[in-house]
Amino acid sequence: MKRIFLLIATNLAVLLVASIVMSILGVNTSTMGGLLVFAAIFGFGGAFISLAISKWMAKKTMGCEVITTPRDSTERWLVETVARQAKQAGIKMPEVAIYQSPDMNAFATGPSKDNSLVAVSTGLLYGMSQDEIEGVLAHEVSHVANGDMVTLTLIQGVVNTFVIFAARVVAGIINNFVSSNDEEGEGLGMFAYMAVVFVLDMLFGILASIIVAYFSRIREYKADEGAARLAGKGKMIAALERLRQGPESTAMPAQMSAFGINGKRSMAEMMMSHPPLEKRIAALRAS
């Protein structure tokens, strides 16, 4: 639930800034073309800025320690495994990092296939067998090779644009309706209009989050398939089985969680960035 809240809050922050800037610049929201252009600038702008700084943000947020020179055999094996899988997948070697967390998790991030980061938690590194870890690493390398970071950024940009545009169009319709039934023809007034826009931003933002989560789940299945090709189906299934036996992951922020191996669980599957582990295992066994 915390992941969902953070995702919605981030989108709402972008939308709120867009509203303030539009008001300051006097953008006429009744002009559909101008509104759509402005919505696209903010919708895609925020998404691509997040993508551009994603690797830097991940290192700072998670306290990732990039392995430049392996200190022991475990770190050496980790780097060599990622290097081998990256070569198999046809991508540039990602940076490899470790972050301190008891959770068994890992994630991939970065603005492109040739500028990426694969990070694993200490809980995963020392709590799984090498075969299981190899499956996890293959999953993350597949995310990079599939271009999932860019794909979901584009999807996020589209839905952000939709939210900004649709909320203000609907608010304009409501304002016109109130104005036509008001003797003075003043409409909602600035503060009431902003309140209506905020509520609509929130409602459309929830819908947008569901759409992004749907596409994220599809990308998870694709990353599992890619991992099965890189490391073998048995290793990927073993990794998922191990994760299923463990506690829910709790320590990863939303932006990294979307590309992690183990997502947050939710009563409503449509709000989850990852399919249930049982479904992922079943899909691999059926493939």
Curated annotation (Swiss-Prot):
Binds 1 zinc ion per subunit. GO terms for molecular function: metalloendopeptidase activity; zinc ion binding. One of its GO terms (biological process) is proteolysis. The chain crosses the membrane at residues 4-24, 33-53, 154-174, 195-215. It is found in: Cell inner membrane. It is an enzyme of class 3 (hydrolase). Its cofactor is Zn(2+). Its main location: membrane. CDD domains: M48B_HtpX_like (cd07335). Keywords: Cell inner membrane, Cell membrane, Hydrolase, Membrane, Metal-binding, Metalloprotease, Protease, Transmembrane, Transmembrane helix, Zinc. This is Protease HtpX. It comes from Shewanella baltica (strain OS155 / ATCC BAA-1091). The gene is htpX.
